[in-house]
Amino acid sequence: MVKKALAALGIVLVLQSLFALCLVSAMQLLVLRNTPFGVTGASPVVNAVTSKVSLETLAYADESAVMEAIGQSKLHGAYLPGQASDTLIVVPAKSFFGRVEIEAAFGDAAKKLERPLTVKTVKPLPEYDRLGGVSGLLLIPLLIGGYLAAVLLLKATRTAAAPWHVAMLVGYATVGAVLTDLIAGPGIGAYTNDHFWPLLPCFILIAASVALAAAAFQRLIGPLGTLEVATLFIIVGGSAAGGVGISLLPDYWQHIGAVFPPQHAITLVRNVIYFDGNSITTPLIVLGLYALGGGVIVGYLGRRRPVKMVGAPAPAVAPVRLTRLTRLTQSKPRSHSPRARRHSSGSSSRWRSPRSCSACSPSTT
């Protein structure tokens, strides 16, 4: 018992250390890295900024092309050099902290080079989401809820996979998405009511992808699948989600996060709220693959292969033995009954018990 307790606490310490390592390394600096940034021409201001800030400059023909790219959620900002003055376009909805760094860097460079600069804000953040953190906050209940749904369903049914698990988890995802949407939208006012219906299928997909994928891991790996899902989806995937902006993460975390649902979930919600649902094809495909793959594994293996039972009671061996013993006892004649005594007294001439045998008894002489 003590060894099991120490082993369990040791596993928790490992997970805690891993969570601290992932989260701090991902969120510690919050500086722009390989950030897509549009330009419409050469400028010494842009050269000065790119020497200090990691920007991936993309050339566009004119301002209208830049605005179209921003509307597609492809740029964090743009610089438009002019004859008398230049224009800096910032996009707070893409990343609030990214906007702060971009505006400060270009403001300092333009001031040093004595270049007049006008700052233009596109896709501003509303008062009820001044830091743009709603998309990241909405991920937490959907992610944790989907994970807990798979874990508690396994614990309640002691069944790692079954065809009806898919229907139950999808039903949970639907109800949970409706509740989350009602609370965050009309209830608290984290976004306007006209986003209620566009966000509802997104919430369902996010919760279902996590729940079904978690159930699939449990079916394939066994009880350790629960621990595996917590490690991959919550500790690693959550650290690389990019709630403050994907471009603010280190490069390796940007690539790691692209493999797991949390980063795509935040991108999906953010683009639906602030970018009219543009550039959501990739998040929909990734989340859909997790949901579809998990559902197929849970449903198919639950139907075609014997279902693994977790924590099933041991077979009742003792009652079987007792039953057999009872039958053997009942099959013996009851010598103490009156009928048995009458039968023994009537047949004493033909049968004697071993104790009454004179040949076997000791001599009394």
Residues of each region from the PLM?
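N-terminal export and membrane-targeting signals
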Residues: 1-12, 131-138, 156-170, 194-198, ...
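Membrane-helix interface and discontinuous TM-entry motifs in multi-pass inner-membrane proteins
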Residues: 76, 112-151
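A local structural motif
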Residues: 34, 50-59, 191-192, 196
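Membrane-spanning alpha-helical segments of multipass transporters and channels
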Residues: 198-324, 339-341
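Extracytoplasmic loops/domains of multi-pass membrane proteins
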Residues: 43, 50-124
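Transmembrane alpha-helical segments that form the functional core of multipass membrane systems
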Residues: 134-242
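Hydrophobic alpha-helical transmembrane segments of multi-pass membrane transport/permease proteins
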Residues: 2-32, 139-149, 234-238, 290, ...
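Cationic, amphipathic, low-complexity alpha-helical segments enriched
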Residues: 326-329, 334, 338-342, 350-355, ...
